[in-house]
Amino acid sequence: MKLTNYDIIRRPLITEKTMASMADKKYTFVVDIHANKSQIKNAIETIFDVKVEDVKTARIMGKTKRVGVHIGKRPDYKKAIVKLTEDSKTIEFFEGL
C-alpha cells in the first residue's frame, strides 16, 4: 500500500517541550509507523512548502493500562522531529499556539 503525504503525517505533537523547540525551527509530528525519514521529509516539504534540514525519528511503545481486572495496551506510534533550514519560513500551522 502506497502512502500519500497526508497519510504519512498523522498529527502534530504539542507538548511544553516541543513548543520550546519551535524557537529553533524544530517541529514534532506523529507519523505513520512504516514511514521512513526520506518519506517524512518529502511530505513535510510538500504539505507546508518549507525546506527540511534534518529529520530524527523515534518509535514510542504504548503503555499498558488497566481498568479493574481488564488489561489493555495503548497503540505504539512513531514521532518525527523535523528541523527546518535557517532561510526557510516557519510553519504557519503552529503560529499563535
UniProtKB/Swiss-Prot annotation:
- What's the protein name? Large ribosomal subunit protein uL23
Biological source species? Clostridium botulinum (strain ATCC 19397 / Type A)
**PROSITE patterns the record matches:** RIBOSOMAL_L23
The biological process GO terms on file are: translation
* HAMAP family found in the cross-reference section: Ribosomal_uL23_B (MF_01369_B)
In UniProt terms, what function does this protein have? One of the early assembly proteins it binds 23S rRNA. One of the proteins that surrounds the polypeptide exit tunnel on the outside of the ribosome. Forms the main docking site for trigger factor binding to the ribosome.
Query: Sorted alphabetically, which keywords does the UniProt record give?
Result: Ribonucleoprotein, Ribosomal protein, RNA-binding, rRNA-binding
Q: Name one GO molecular function term.
A: rRNA binding
Q: InterPro entries, from UniProt?
A: Nucleotide-bd_a/b_plait_sf, Ribosomal_uL23-like, Ribosomal_uL23/eL15/eS24_sf, Ribosomal_uL23_CS
**Listed Pfam families:** Ribosomal_L23
- Name the gene behind this protein: rplW
- Quaternary structure note: Part of the 50S ribosomal subunit. Contacts protein L29, and trigger factor when it is bound to the ribosome.
GO cellular component terms, alphabetically, are: ribonucleoprotein complex; ribosome
Q: Does the keyword Signal apply?
A: no
Query: What family does the entry list?
Result: Belongs to the universal ribosomal protein uL23 family.
